[in-house]
A protein has these predicted regions:
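C-terminal structural segment of proteins
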Residues: 1-183
Length: 183
């Protein structure tokens, strides 16, 4: 199937992406990996008039421990999580989740942030992020908001993200020992 017609926008900065979101409102959707959005468009379940491709924005793909947090950038691919030595050694629950998502082709495109922002209850990461007590860091015209994962999901395919916000990163408390688990 071919999706309905849409206008493709490719900002180079977060402020530019936010400006597009403000300009086009609810008729715009963010495209990061597109692994859930594009199929929904093909089935006419989503019909955005504007796709805002944020893949050209630099500085949104990272996995790093900083202070007391592990931070995963908004454009970090599932494959990066699966192949990260840090994730594999200290955060095996994330590794185990990432490695079973679809197939390698999907994991090379799909993002953790997109997985969460899409709000699909069938996705793999929401349960993992709930278990880890994650925080979603969103940025919009009013600045940055830190959203606890426990209150992030509203209902099917709906989150507390405003129409003019982008997920900049997902963060949660660091694990200080290899093989530390959750009980």
């Amino acid at each position: 199937m071919i999706p309905p017609a849409f206008e493709y926008l490719r900002p180079n900065t977060i402020p530019e992406a936010i400006a597009f979101l403000q300009q086009y409102g609810d008729d715009a959707k963010i495209l990061s990996g597109g692994q859930s959005l594009i199929p929904m468009m093909k089935f006419r379940l989503a019909r955005p008039g504007y796709l805002i491709d944020i893949n050209r924005i630099s500085g949104l793909s990272y996995i790093k421990e900083e202070a007391e947090y592990l931070k995963i950038g908004g454009l970090t691919r599932e494959a990066e999580l699966e192949n990260s030595l840090l994730i594999h050694s200290k955060y095996p629950i994330i590794f185990d989740t990432a490695r079973v998502i679809a197939d390698p082709q999907v994991r090379n495109m799909a993002t953790l942030a997109g997985n969460l922002a899409h709000g699909d209850p069938a996705n793999d990461h929401p349960a993992t992020m709930l278990a880890l007590g994650a925080q979603v860091v969103a940025v919009g015209p009013q600045g940055e908001r830190v959203l606890p994962i426990e209150s992030f999901f509203v209902t099917l395919f709906t989150t507390v993200l405003q129409h003019d916000e982008i997920v900049r990163e997902v963060a949660f408390l660091r694990r200080h020992h290899e093989a530390e688990g959750l009980t």
